[in-house]
């Protein structure tokens, strides 16, 4: 069941759901807007001959932070990692779904490639997979609305929420745009 604005506010008031910093003006009828943080991870296209999900490739990306008051420019065809300004903490019976903002999609900005689902129990800044599919550069301003978080109530609390030892939660507590850790649980057959 998708939570309404009333339910979102009740979960935050009960301190079961946390988005810090919280701004009540960001609550929408069935979602809450999230804003863009100021850190980005850009890909180093000359460090490796290819990307291998089975390998740890520490120099695949570089952390970039625009100067105060300046935007990050995302060029056509470029893919970078960003993150939400908000630290998001979900209880064991709520899952999240990150969706892009329609107004930004109409400009050619994709907010996430595939990883729009947030497990119950997750706590951290949500990493964004930002792509420019337009023919012109797009300026990304720190603090701008970048997506909307929809919240879904589970039929019962998760037995092993994200962050529990049984799950192997590679991104719990992440701060800023976090590079892939796919190598940690990659299985070669």
Swiss-Prot record:
**Chain segments annotated as coiled-coil in the UniProt record:** none
Q: Which reaction does it catalyse?
A: dCTP + 2 H2O = dUMP + NH4(+) + diphosphate
Instruction: Give the residues the record marks as binding dCTP.
Output: 101-106, 119, 127-129, 148, 162, 174
Q: Which InterPro entries match?
A: dCTP_deaminase (IPR011962), dUTPase-like_sf (IPR036157), dUTPase_trimeric (IPR033704)
Which keywords accompany this UniProt record?
Answer: Hydrolase, Nucleotide metabolism, Nucleotide-binding
List the residue ranges of the region (Disordered): 166-189
Q: Name one GO molecular function term.
A: dCTP deaminase activity
**Pathway involvement?**
Pyrimidine metabolism; dUMP biosynthesis; dUMP from dCTP: step 1/1
Annotated catalytic residues = 129 (proton donor/acceptor)
Q: Which domain of life is it from?
A: Bacteria
The EC number of this protein is 3.5.4.30
Record GO biological process: dUMP biosynthetic process; dUTP biosynthetic process; nucleobase-containing small molecule interconversion
Compositional bias ranges of the Polar residues kind: 171-189
Q: Which top-level enzyme class is recorded in the Swiss-Prot or TrEMBL entry?
A: hydrolase
| Site feature (Important for bifunctional activity) residues | 116-117
Q: Report quaternary structure and partners.
A: Homotrimer.
Q: What does this protein do?
A: Bifunctional enzyme that catalyzes both the deamination of dCTP to dUTP and the hydrolysis of dUTP to dUMP without releasing the toxic dUTP intermediate.
Q: Member of which family?
A: Belongs to the dCTP deaminase family.
Listed HAMAP family: dCTP_deaminase (MF_00146)
List the protein's name. dCTP deaminase, dUMP-forming
What organism is recorded for this protein?
A: Mycolicibacterium smegmatis (strain ATCC 700084 / mc(2)155) (Mycobacterium smegmatis)
Q: Which gene encodes it?
A: dcd
């Amino acid at each position: 069941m998708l939570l309404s604005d009333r339910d979102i506010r009740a979960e935050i008031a009960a301190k079961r759901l946390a988005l810090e910093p919280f701004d009540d003006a960001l609550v929408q009828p069935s979602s809450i807007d999230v804003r863009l943080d100021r850190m980005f991870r850009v890909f180093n296209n000359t460090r490796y001959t290819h990307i291998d999900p089975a390998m740890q490739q520490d120099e695949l990306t570089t952390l970039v932070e625009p100067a105060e008051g300046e935007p990050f420019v995302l060029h056509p065809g470029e893919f970078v990692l960003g993150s939400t300004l908000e630290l998001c903490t979900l209880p064991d019976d709520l899952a999240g779904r990150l969706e892009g903002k329609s107004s930004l999609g109409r400009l050619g900005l994709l907010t996430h490639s595939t990883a729009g689902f947030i497990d119950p129990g997750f706590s951290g800044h949500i990493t964004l997979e930002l792509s420019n599919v337009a023919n012109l550069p797009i300026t990304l301003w720190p603090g701008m609305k970048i997506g909307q978080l929809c919240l879904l109530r589970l039929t019962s609390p998760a037995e092993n929420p994200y962050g529990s030892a049984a799950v192997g939660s590679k991104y719990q507590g992440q701060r800023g745009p976090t590079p892939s850790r796919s190598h940690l649980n990659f299985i070669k057959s």
